[in-house]
């Protein structure tokens, strides 16, 4: 067996991020051949990934990337098994690399990411193979759970990520004054993250949701002994409160609870002589 130098072990560690003892073993197993040692570690990572495939990966982080011109944005959820790994530089750096690659290539789903190749820092492997390698490096199941992309040619994309990186949102505003709308867009992203709306406008609340809520409100009123002739009025009132919870434009504004989001948009438009509206949003909460 050839002599394995400390420098070779360090070089392999720098190339792969794997622990020193594992790097030494890989070099010993491959007769000191650096490329074969890298392949050995990749195979070991793939084997561990297969072994841990059935494990639950419920920890992790949300990562967001926005283009320099604020016309594209990506949000991802990358999972692992423990909070300890989720907070580590290797894991957070990996999430950032995936989000950067998705933004650069305009990828809109986790599935479409798998064949794309990450950079030299990840051995120019595909995302799919890099996930296996990272599983071997960190000793936990790693999973790219979901990914969403927003793009606009008529407005601005903005984001908010809550401290701890377990909650985040990206939003698209249609506006003829994107630069002036940047702060407003960030506020709306914070609103989405904090208040968890399900739609922008009440007109697109799914009909089945409305009927389900109305039936719940109706049964609640009857079980409380409300006179039947007043039940429909009660249902209507409670439905309005429901809209204020789930419809973004009807929610109390997070920075001023006396104003609604719709009113904030209208006031901004009036003051700035701008056309502005919320087109869509994506909100991710870890595990939700």
Swiss-Prot record:
Pfam families: EF_TS
CDD domains, A to Z: UBA_EF-Ts
InterPro entries the record matches: EF-Ts_dimer_sf, Transl_elong_EFTs/EF1B, Transl_elong_EFTs/EF1B_dimer, Transl_elong_Ts_CS, UBA-like_sf
Main location: cytoplasm
UniProt xrefs under PROSITE patterns: EF_TS_1, EF_TS_2
Record keywords: Cytoplasm, Elongation factor, Protein biosynthesis
GO cellular component: cytoplasm
Function: Associates with the EF-Tu.GDP complex and induces the exchange of GDP to GTP. It remains bound to the aminoacyl-tRNA.EF-Tu.GTP complex up to the GTP hydrolysis stage on the ribosome.
NCBIfam families given in the database record: tsf (TIGR00116)
Protein's name in the database: Elongation factor Ts
Species whose genome carries this gene: Prosthecochloris aestuarii (strain DSM 271 / SK 413)
Organismal lineage: Bacteria, Pseudomonadati, Chlorobiota, Chlorobiia, Chlorobiales
């Amino acid at each position: 067996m050839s002599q394995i130098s400390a420098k070779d072990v360090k070089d392999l560690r720098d190339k792969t991020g794997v622990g020193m003892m594992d790097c030494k073993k890989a070099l010993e197993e491959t007769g000191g051949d650096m490329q074969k040692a890298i392949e050995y570690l990749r195979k070991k990572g793939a084997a561990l990934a297969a072994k841990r495939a059935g494990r639950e990966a419920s920890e992790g982080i949300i990562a967001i990337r926005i283009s320099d011109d604020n016309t594209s944005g990506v949000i991802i959820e990358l999972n692992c098994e423990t909070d300890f790994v989720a907070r580590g530089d290797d894991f957070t750096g990996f999430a950032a690399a995936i989000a950067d690659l998705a933004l650069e290539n305009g990828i809109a789903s986790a599935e479409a990411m798998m064949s794309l190749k990450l950079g030299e820092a990840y051995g120019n492997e595909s995302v799919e193979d890099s996930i296996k390698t990272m599983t071997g490096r960190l000793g936990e199941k790693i999973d790219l759970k979901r990914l969403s992309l927003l793009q606009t040619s008529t407005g601005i994309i903005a984001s908010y990520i809550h401290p701890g990186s377990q909650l985040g949102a990206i939003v698209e505003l249609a506006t003829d004054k994107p630069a002036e709308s940047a702060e407003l867009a960030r506020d709306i992203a914070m609103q989405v993250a904090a208040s968890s709306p399900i739609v922008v406008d009440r007109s697109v609340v799914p009909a089945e949701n409305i009927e389900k809520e109305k039936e719940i409100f109706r049964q609640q009123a009857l079980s409380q002994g409300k006179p039947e002739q007043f039940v429909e009025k009660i249902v209507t009132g409670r439905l309005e409160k429901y809209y204020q919870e789930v419809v973004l434009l009807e929610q109390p504004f997070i920075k001023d609870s006396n104003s609604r989001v719709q009113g904030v948009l209208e006031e901004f438009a009036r003051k700035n002589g701008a056309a502005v509206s919320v087109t869509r949003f994506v909100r991710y909460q870890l595990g939700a």
